[in-house]
Regions:
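Short, Lys/Arg-enriched charge-dense amphipathic segments
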Residues: 59-69, 89-103, 118-137, 146-149, ...
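Residues that form generic nucleotide/phosphate-binding pockets
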Residues: 61, 86, 109, 128, ...
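Catalytic adenosine-cofactor/nucleotide-binding cores of aminoacyl-tRNA synthetases and other
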Residues: 102, 236-237, 246-334
């Protein structure tokens, strides 16, 4: 059994807020409760929205709250070779394909088929550019030489999508409406038909940026992440990531999706909903006092008792045992 590894993976689009501190605290406590390591990954693949200043601010905030990673943080923007290799692997087995459809064209195709999405709902790709499934009697492997030398950057305005039906066929599943099932340590038994709910999702965007789903799956495997602890708003990403893990021959971690911090109107607290940066003190003593107060509030969201400690580091140690009792009791059922 591999040693436990957890991670916190913020996007450097701004400072940490109360909601992101809950995610950081939960992942840190879970790693420590399992005697494992805790890593920080800076998810900066959406480069136009990210900044180095925000990255430095995030790391400083984590240090103020005694949430110290066990290795230097890695940046997704430095890992494009890994993502290219994964996409080439999928292409070699005909599990991915190019798509030149714009969002407007996808919406029009859905409307023509009577499947127009509800307002604010995501567009489920109708398969306009999807190639036919390869015959089971013929080779399903593309030319290795052609794939190895292929330059994705030369394909302007072209996205690359996962061929879900081909992924299922490769596993011996002929029915495209196959249900992906998994067990969440908080939410319990979960299931989703990825083909119907998400469709052939994007792996590399038409603007040349790598998609979140591919990057997170590749990085979790490369970093040996065994326990993923994150907010409940990300739970619906899990089945897509499991399908992609299976297509790439990668292990599937354990998942725990934790409660969210919400606004007064019930929306998830985020930068988009006006979340303020974590409050700080004006000197080292007031900084420590404020950090402890921030952690106490985050622990409350996670159902943990108040800590009597007088420092962030001591409070964290007190909460490890409480975390085991609250969040690790269902692991034997997985």
């Amino acid at each position: 059994t591999p040693p436990c590894s957890g991670r916190f993976a913020p996007s450097p689009t701004g400072a940490l807020h109360a909601g992101s501190l809950v995610a950081a605290l939960a992942s840190w406590l879970d790693a420590r409760a399992h005697g494992g390591r805790w890593l920080v990954r800076i998810e900066d693949i959406d480069t136009p929205r990210c900044s180095t200043q925000a990255q430095h601010t995030i790391m400083r905030q984590l240090e103020q709250h005694a949430l110290l990673p066990d290795a230097a943080p890695v940046l997704q923007s430095h890992r494009t070779a890994l993502y290219q290799s994964a996409l080439r692997q999928l292409l070699q087995h005909r599990l991915a394909y190019p798509c030149t459809c714009s969002r407007k064209q996808i919406a029009a195709a859905l409307a023509n088929a009577g499947n127009a999405p509800e307002r604010h709902a995501g567009l489920i790709y109708p398969g306009t550019c999807r190639p036919a499934l390869p015959s089971l009697n013929t080779s399903t492997q593309a030319s290795t030489d052609d794939i190895a030398t292929f330059d994705f950057a030369t394909q302007a305005h072209t996205a690359w999508r996962l061929h879900i039906a081909a992924c299922l066929q490769r596993q011996g599943i002929a029915e495209p409406s196959h249900i992906t099932r998994w067990s969440d340590r908080s939410l319990g038994a979960q299931q989703q038909c990825v083909a119907h709910t998400a469709g052939d999702f994007v792996l590399r965007r038409a603007d040349g940026l790598w998609a979140y789903q591919l990057a997170v799956v590749v990085d979790d495997a490369a970093q040996g992440i065994t326990h993923i602890v994150r907010g409940a708003d990300l739970a619906d990403n899990t089945p897509r990531q499991i399908v992609l893990q299976q297509a790439l021959g990668l292990p599937t971690p354990q998942y725990l999706h934790t409660p969210l911090v919400c606004t007064a109107s019930g929306e998830k607290l985020s930068k988009q909903t006006g979340a303020a940066p974590l409050p700080e003190g004006h000197n080292s003593q007031s900084n420590r006092t404020q950090a402890l107060a921030n952690l106490q509030a985050a622990a409350l969201v996670l159902g943990l008792p108040p800590s009597s400690a007088n420092s962030p580091a001591r409070a964290l140690q007190q909460w490890v045992a409480a975390w085991v009792g609250k969040w690790c009791k269902n692991e034997a059922l997985l």
